[in-house]
Design a protein with these regions (language model features):
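Non-heme di-metal
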Residues: 2-219
């Protein structure tokens, strides 16, 4: 972040929450090429952001349906689904305010490529799904923070402030998913986390032909 951007953010009273646990968790930061492209294509960013929030709520409900025997999962996923749907409605309102038509757009490769690596055993599949949930929430958190300085520079102060407000929520979801992954297995999850994070890093840093909120380097 440049001195000008830092000064602008402080003057406007916008503070990007520091989430060191996310920085320590992810293996890479968002490439600047993605940030630059996103700032020029905010309509796509917002549409896909809305879709991501809806999908996150759907994933939480799916986990509740598939694993009803886990009380703590039910509690956390109920709260998460409710919050994700609230965020979905907020982004829909932003789209309407901007005159952008909300629509379904084809998903990028990100989630699909990671989920292809789910283990086939029942417990392995379950734990992997929770770990991947944590990874996606962590990346969302990091991307919101990456966008804020450029949004302020472009005069998108309201959107920058909104994205700052989402950072702590996404970090909380990240922590919740990791907590559940550790809770429901007796084996250390660190090796599996490292393996899935390496896949995520490759997707974030490699060229990507379809620009989306979680896509790789635009090409």
């Amino acid at each position: 972040m440049s001195v000008i951007e830092t000064s602008s953010i402080e003057t406007l009273g916008i503070e990007i929450p520091a989430i060191p646990e996310i920085d320590a968790f992810l293996l890479c930061v968002t490439p600047q090429a993605w940030v630059d492209y996103a700032l020029k294509n905010l309509d796509v960013v917002l549409i896909d952001h809305a879709l991501c929030e809806k999908k996150a709520a759907s994933t939480a409900i799916s986990l509740m349906h598939r694993y009803p025997q886990y009380d703590e999962l039910l509690d956390k996923m109920t709260a998460l689904a409710r919050e994700e749907l609230t965020h979905f409605k907020q982004v829909i309102n932003l789209l309407r305010e901007r005159g952008i038509t909300y629509q379904n757009i084809a998903p990028g490769r990100y989630a699909g490529k990671i989920f292809k690596h789910l283990r086939t055993s029942e417990l392995g599949h379950f734990i992997d799904a929770l770990i991947i949930g944590a990874i996606i929430e962590a990346r969302s958190c990091e991307r919101f923070a990456a966008l804020v300085p450029g949004l302020v520079t472009q005069g998108e102060v309201a959107l920058a402030g909104y994205y700052c407000s989402l950072i702590k929520a996404e970090a909380r979801h990240f922590e919740g998913y990791l907590y559940l992954a550790e809770l429901y297995t007796d084996e250390p999850i660190a090796p599996r986390v490292a393996s899935l994070l390496a896949i995520e890093q490759q997707l974030i840093q490699s060229p990507d032909t379809k620009f989306r909120f979680h896509s790789g380097v635009p090409c």
